[in-house]
């Protein structure tokens, strides 16, 4: 697809968004739930990227006024993630939410977030994981990885 291709926003059903994330996301499975999803499609109507927005994963951030972009996934088409981060914030505000956050992992630049006007507000050190001898648990994919917390403008 050309760098000059025109992208537009499209509604995406939960199942379609989850399938897209399953195919294209680099390191996580689709999230368990969502409030809404939005997609970016090209001029031919081909879905090029999705954003899934839901309740914050961290309980202390789940205050009823905050949502979290829990996944974005793209087929590599330029500018799709910035488009989706901006659209997600506009949709969240229209639904009455006052805050939208997301996390990036160490090694991810955050260029799409900066392009959409988001602010880096905190850095989180790597977690040791949830496994304990009394309660064995499998890792969830982002243990031992530093993360950055971003907030919509």
Protein language model regions, located:
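Short amphipathic alpha-helix that is part of the acyltransferase structural core
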Residues: 1-31
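Generic, low-specificity signal for short hydrophobic/alpha-helical stretches with a mild N-terminal bias
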Residues: 2-3, 20-22, 51, 95, ...
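Acyl-donor binding region in acyl/amide transferases
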Residues: 8-11, 35, 41-42, 47, ...
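Active-site beta-strand termini and strand-to-loop segments that position acidic
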Residues: 40-43, 151-153
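Class I (Rossmann-like) S-adenosyl-L-methionine-dependent methyltransferase catalytic domain
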Residues: 143-148
């Amino acid at each position: 697809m050309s760098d000059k291709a025109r992208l537009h926003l499209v509604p995406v059903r939960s199942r379609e968004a989850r399938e897209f994330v399953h195919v294209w996301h680099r390191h996580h499975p689709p999230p368990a739930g969502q409030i809404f999803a939005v997609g970016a499609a090209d001029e031919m109507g081909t879905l090029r990227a999705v954003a899934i927005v839901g309740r914050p994963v961290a309980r202390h951030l789940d205050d009823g006024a905050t949502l979290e972009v829990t996944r974005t996934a793209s087929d590599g088409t330029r500018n799709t993630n910035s488009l989706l981060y901006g659209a997600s914030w506009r949709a969240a505000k229209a639904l009455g939410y006052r805050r939208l956050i997301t996390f990036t992992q160490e090694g991810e630049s955050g260029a799409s977030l900066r392009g959409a006007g988001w602010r880096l507000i905190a850095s989180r050190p790597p977690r040791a994981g949830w496994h304990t001898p009394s309660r064995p648990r499998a890792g969830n994919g982002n243990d031992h990885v530093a993360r950055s917390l971003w907030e919509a403008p």
